[in-house]
Amino acid sequence: MITEKKILKFRDLSLNKLKLMVKEVRNQKSIEERNVVSFSKNFTLSLSNYCQNQCGYCFYNHHIPKSGKDENRALIESEEIHDLIDKGIRYRCKEALLMSGENPGKFEIVQKKLKEMNFDRFIDFIVHISSLLLDNDILPHTNIGVLPYEELKELKKFNASMGLMLESTSQKLFQQGGVHEYSPSKAPSIRINHIKNAGKLKIPFTTGLLIGIGEKFKDRVNALYTLKEIHNQFGHIQEVILQNFVYKKGIPYLPDKHLKIEELLKITGVARLIFGNEIPIQVPPNLIKGYEKDFLELGIDDFGGISPLTIDYINPSKPWPMIEELDQICSRSGFHLKERLPIYDKFINKEGFISENIKKKLQSIN
């Protein structure tokens, strides 16, 4: 367990000092890997906005009125799935992110749509889409909230990797007026259990923190150490995302004070010191425009999924950067941008971490 003294030591580090310490960590990598920053060219299948939680910061939730590309839907139509797959093939995307609200199948309107499409359960719908993607040489990465162990086990057969944000370990967020007041399954114990179950099943896993939703610096550090302990036990966390909160019109949550970029930079550097070179750190590039060089110097080595054809459904007002533009920024900053798959290389040959379905597809994709 992290001590208060250690947290204070991290807090008191200047950004310049952190950059020097991060450089020392990075220099422990081989020369070939030292300045490589990865990304995955992907597209998103936004399956359903219906969600059993009502997080105060969430714009994606079906309770928030929307129109246009990010309009609410009970269930994505079959025609749109096929259209996006066709476009994904044309753009040479190797990953499809399957996302939805949590447990949309509990809502009657979603159940009705599933029945119309001949599916008994939402998970059957996910398996169907994942199989369809694999048939088209696109690797699925599913992030649809907390799932039972058996459903995780089923999805592993058809997914290259999966994800669930820890978000925070702060209990304060569940108090009256907190962002998780009406979100019972955002309890840290429930999400930690899900992440551990993924570890037991040897699923290459993406997780991370939401920064600026009412938590304190010490909460961020505690959450990072929680993820480190889980990874030390199971070895399955392939990347940690540090995602800053961005305000959107219509959401209930209005922070007392807005997150400063320096706060995000600091926790990024601290995360690199905590994880060393064991786990890649990602900050979404569309949320840090103009500060990419600073984040590179403070330890990020991944930009995550970047889509040439679908929006960021969580932050629809923040367009993805052009890959060519990001490549130029990296080059000017002394880094090399490199495309990756939704499963990191080290997990491909790691015993038990990919199913036979995925193994076959990796051979044809590579």
Give the positions of each predicted feature:
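Auxiliary Fe-S-binding modules of radical SAM enzymes
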Residues: 1-16, 20, 82, 89, ...
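Short, well-ordered alpha-helical
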Residues: 4, 8, 13-49
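Canonical Radical SAM [4Fe-4S] cluster-binding loop centered on the CxxxCxxC motif
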Residues: 37-80, 103
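Hydrophobic faces of well-ordered beta-strands that scaffold small-molecule active sites
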Residues: 37-45, 94-98, 140-142, 162-164, ...
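Glycine-rich, proline-tolerant flexible connector loops at the mouths of alpha/beta enzymes
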Residues: 41-43, 69, 99-118, 246-252, ...
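Active-site-proximal loop/turn and secondary-structure-junction residues that shape catalytic pockets
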Residues: 43-45, 102-104, 144-148, 168-170, ...
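Short, composition-biased local secondary-structure segments
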Residues: 56, 97-101, 117-127, 167, ...
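Conserved Radical SAM active-site core
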Residues: 64-232
